């Protein structure tokens, strides 16, 4: 994750060997993966083109009371009556007028909210293939457009429904239509391709293998109407999305130069999807991060952290956070863009997910070198982190704990003392009773780093007393560490025992505290302790 020289330096300089550099600088794991699987409010992977208000009014204002009657008819209509024999007959006729009329009827059916009859349409023999055939009618752009709209809405359905469109051979034709002379046809084609690519990594890779990127980037490079640009950059973000497996970077990286100027388009939707695309491209090993940095997007991404719409802030923050999972040099690029002031601002966001993501980003900066930890100190970020550690939701507190423990692991004596003076000990002690084993370990590591410094200071001064032991006891930390000796996690109970033995032991220590050893099982046997009064906290 870092260059070999850097890694050797880090391994020597980190006082806490239980959190190695790879662990400290964390890629998005566990919770992040779950977040990615969810359909975020800010981002839709599939979209249906619905009928306009004018068209619906046109259809529904019939005779006296026609609007109410149409509503009742829609509610009562059975699936068997949705597609009439006339529609099927017309679509297979040789008359262009009848073909267009029938295609429009299908399109209106599939544009209805909330449950379009996609299954009825795809189960009608030959209909999907007929619409794909209509895509080829260059002499009739209206028919092309209507057929593309129908197929877009079929592809907005579930994976099986999307696969029907792929199997009918629509994708290569849609890619050809990106170069159509007619903007409406181009836009509908890009919408369809975005839906198909957004279905799954398999569909995404198939669309990429059909060589969508050159014509899509060509389309984006033109001065288009804004709806076209929105659809195209949304489709592009779907082509970059996905982790298992990620897209072939060689196939998607050519879009970086286009994304770099899309970040300056004055449209919230375009900015949001461009940032999502960059967040996907930067989510990976350092060579991918470097390609994103080389595209020159970092300064603009940092600027967008202060955008007034969370729809933009969220993916911009995700991209910035991914970049600082790289090595120290890559992290420094973000720091050189004055990111810390923006991150400090985001730590007070009313949106919890933004606070959490900002803490995660900072935790990867504090996993850097001492100069980088100092820039975080100079930006007055740690007081806000300690406040979060005491008051925020648990998922956010976890990230703040990583940020503080990372700083105690790689920081200098002065930097660690600064954190102690800010009051980091009590909130770290409070984390010792949570149910999340990993965070208990993180808190223990932070406290161990502080205790180790206290021991060094006491030896240097000749006082013989570790000043931080008393602070931990005052925060009820010792009681909690003692309780952890009966923890089910072996690393936790071993660490708890070691801390007590090394830093809190006395010559007349009660021998009953020390665990017995089960030689047959190669493990310690701990006596059951009563839980502290406050119990486990989440």
Curated annotation (Swiss-Prot):
Keywords: Cytoplasm, Nucleus, Protein transport, Repeat, Transport. Pfam families: Arm (PF00514), Arm_3 (PF16186), IBB (PF01749). Disulfide bonds: none annotated. Residues 245-437 are annotated as: Binding to RAG1. Residues 318-406 are annotated as: NLS binding site (minor). One of its GO terms (molecular function) is nuclear localization sequence binding. Residues 20-38 have a biased composition (Basic and acidic residues). Gene3D superfamilies: Importin-alpha, importin-beta-binding domain, Leucine-rich Repeat Variant. It comes from the Eukaryota. Residues 1-38 are annotated as: Disordered. ARM repeats lie at residues 77-117, 118-161, 162-206, 207-245, 246-290, 291-330, 331-372, 373-412, 413-457, 460-504. Its main location: cytoplasm. One of its GO terms (cellular component) is dendrite. A motif (Nuclear localization signal) lies at residues 42-51. Residues 149-241 are annotated as: NLS binding site (major). InterPro entries: ARM-like, ARM-type_fold, Arm_3, Armadillo, Importin-a_IBB, Importin-a_IBB_sf, Importin_alpha. Residues 1-57 form the IBB domain. It is found in: Cytoplasm; Nucleus. SUPFAM superfamilies: ARM repeat (SSF48371). Belongs to the importin alpha family. Forms a complex with importin subunit beta-1. The importin beta binding domain (IBB domain), which is sufficient for binding importin beta and essential for nuclear protein import confers import only, but not re-export out of the nucleus. Essential for selective protein import into nucleus. Promotes signal-dependent binding of karyophilic proteins to the nuclear envelope. This is Importin subunit alpha-5. It comes from Gallus gallus.
